[in-house]
Amino acid sequence: FKKVYFCLQIYSFKEMNELEFQKDITLIAAASDNHALGKDNQLIWHISDDLKRFKRLTSGHAIIMGRKTFESMPKALPNRKNIILTRNRSYQALDAFVAHTIEEALSLAADDPQPFIIGGGEIYSLFLPLADTLELTRVHGHFEADAFFPKIDPQNWKLVAEEKHAASQDQDF
């Protein structure tokens, strides 16, 4: 296994979004320097500290994800309102809500002032123009992938916090 260092980056949108949903829509992801997220519907790495951070930040909140992301998990994530965005009108999921449009997904998250968008690549691209905050773990390295995080335009986003971490024994790649 390859050990690499990573850094946590928090970005805020520089100006108000065109479509204001009265929410702090937050994209949360771990992506490599080449924007890789996953391959074959699985995460490329396992970084224990980052998974704990994900759990801490998203617990008690609505989480919006694509169908493939939901199906990559053994079950709906506990202590969260799981919302699946899919084009499949007949899709059903145990312990989760199903939406077919961005507006429908946000409507299902109406009771949460800070819903989290948790993937995958297509879903991040759909919600990036609506997001207020990016909680991004940048895994340093280039990885082969088939799902990617969208590029962040520095004209629109401002880095407001960064925390660097060295490689540790609890990382699997």
What is the meaning of each model-derived region?
Residues 16-24:
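Extreme N-terminus of proteins, especially the signal/transit-peptide cleavage junction
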Residues 22, 28-173:
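Flexible, gly/pro- and Lys/Arg-enriched active-site loops
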